[in-house]
Amino acid sequence: GEVVFDMCAAPGGKSTELAAKLNKTGLLVTNDISNSRAKALLKNVEVFGVPNLCVLNEDPVGIASRFSGFFDKVLIDAPCSGEGMFRKDNKLIKAWEKNGPEFYSQIQKNIILAGADMLKPGGKLLYSTCTFSKLEDEDSVIHLLTNRPDMHLIDIKPYEGFCHGFDTDEGYHLEKAVRIFPHKMSGEGHFVALFEKDGEDYTSSKRPVSGKTKLPVELKDFMDNTTFEYDLSLIHI
């Protein structure tokens, strides 16, 4: 099964959707750097009853230093200035005045590079925000493509109301990214970009095919790279 990482997962809606897609196969690792939000994340995924799950409360950059090239797929719903949500929540306007796009841009650039580093060759990374700011959207994409030349943008299945990313005519193919505007389709403002890492397709890599008495390779690799002690009697395969 696939090994999937939800980097900025709280409160857990995306993680439960990913868990449903995995359908009790592979491994889902979810993380949030905020202690309080990680607790909410843990509570929500426990209610959902996800059996193949590990919840972390760590800095993504630190995780990347231990799990380089580990995940088949990475989801980054990045912390952002929230411009796309102003219509829904007026409190976000006050938050934007305190910490605007410039504040979040550096955070996003760090975590998008960390996400790429944790991705296997042939794996896919989805980067999203709920802001209109080019600084947080297309500029984050350019930062990744410039610093990780083994990453490239791929097309996202079009839907009515989707708009292309703001292209710069500099060869980055930013038109493959998607912008969602509330006056174009139902919902709030969002930005989405899908990347693929160069190299052998991860689906062709060797996977464990048998041995019910043994831990799946992807789970054992993860446990071997953590500092926690696990009670194997509580792990049911």
Task: Label each PLM-derived region with a short phrase.
Residues 1-235:
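S-adenosylmethionine
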